[in-house]
Amino acid sequence: MKRKKFLALAPAGVMTAVTLTACAPLDALYDWFFGGGGSASHGSEKGRVTESEELEKQLEKYFGLSETTASDRAKQTLEAVAKGFDATWLDNNKLNDKAKDALIPITQDKVQAKQALWVDVMELTSPDGTADITLDNRPIYSDRYVDPGPDSGDPYHWVYLVDPSNLRRELDYYKKNDAELYAGTFQKDGKNYAAMVTIMNGWW
């Protein structure tokens, strides 16, 4: 179940994003790939993000989350990712080191101490809009703001690419059903992308 509770953007927030690409209209892609239903649109122009509740439900199932929050900061982070996205961020439709470096300035002013943020982006490549949106065995972007505590050093960002199965294990271990999740689609240079933003608060 998703709580449609939009949180105010804090001085430093957290989030993750997803992108989608195809020749068919987005509504048709949703109906074909996700088995019907609709999407909540938040803008259809190029570079604007359209929320996909179908994809969010798929991610909730993958991560084993019974309840998530759609926050303003997750939405705004996803929009920033979509705006800055470049096709060179993907190798074999997976995020690469160039994507990691480009995402750092987008996410680091949005992550607070003891929060973790994940982003994934993928293109829909086939003419009919189909894509294998399996998260296993693909690197996703991870930004953790580590606070060692008093007399143990300054807070720092720990940024790397990680398999989403690690995120699934952490969400299960820490019982983070209050995670913030936002997923949607955008267009860039004639292509459609799917993207996700996930935020976990208090990861240790």
In which residue ranges do the predicted regions lie?
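A well-ordered secondary-structure block
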Residues: 104-204
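Bacterial Sec-type N-terminal signal peptides, specifically the leucine/valine-rich hydrophobic h-region
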Residues: 17-20
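Short, low-structural-confidence N-terminal segments
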Residues: 4, 30-33
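Bacterial Sec-dependent N-terminal signal peptides
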Residues: 1-8
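Short, well-ordered surface patches within globular domains
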Residues: 32-121
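Surface-exposed receptor/substrate recognition regions of extracellular proteins
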Residues: 26
